[in-house]
Amino acid sequence: MADRYPGYDVLDKWDSPSFDDVTRDVLTDRLDRIPARRFLDEREWALLEAVVARLLPQPDRADPIPVTPWIDRMLAEDRGEGFRHEGDPPMRALWREGLAALSDEAPGFATFAAEEQDALLGRVQRGEVQSDRWRAVNPKRFFAQLLRAAAGIYYAHPAAWNEIGFGGPANPRGYVRLGFDERDRWEAQEAHDG
């Protein structure tokens, strides 16, 4: 991936007015306090790792952003979005059933070539599944839940912020320049071709 924000590192703002103590504590958690496995079993964890690696590939990253540990923590603490679709099982059961159905749909998913994994995930996303295990959970909704959780966790990490030029929460510094094509001096400068 091309570096759209060359030289930008949001963590350079650590001791600046851009970050307050609460922000620094949250970022310390995301960077240094990666949760241990508490909810998923080893097979579920390995499958989720393989799925996340296809949804959010990180081939050029020396230290990939950890996503599975944070999903596992969310499940262990039973912290969801505060709603569920009619007919869906509770969140933890949804994840267990969804991962079991995915495993049944494609035994050995983690060993498949990337193209095969992507094709299978596309079928799940479209609801074009074969396994009877999907009767317990809607494949389209499970895929949407999986993608939302994975992307939300990924883009909560400072390394992902660097990729998109995000400077972190606006408090306490706030935004001043709000006009078209204006940016505050603390915002990342995007590289332009030519």
Task: Kindly label every feature range from the protein language model.
Residues D15-S18:
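Intrinsic disorder at enzyme termini
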Residues D20-D21, L178:
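Functionally engaged cysteine thiol sites
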Residues M1-K13, V26-R33, R43-A50, R54-G194:
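Mature-region segments of soluble proteins
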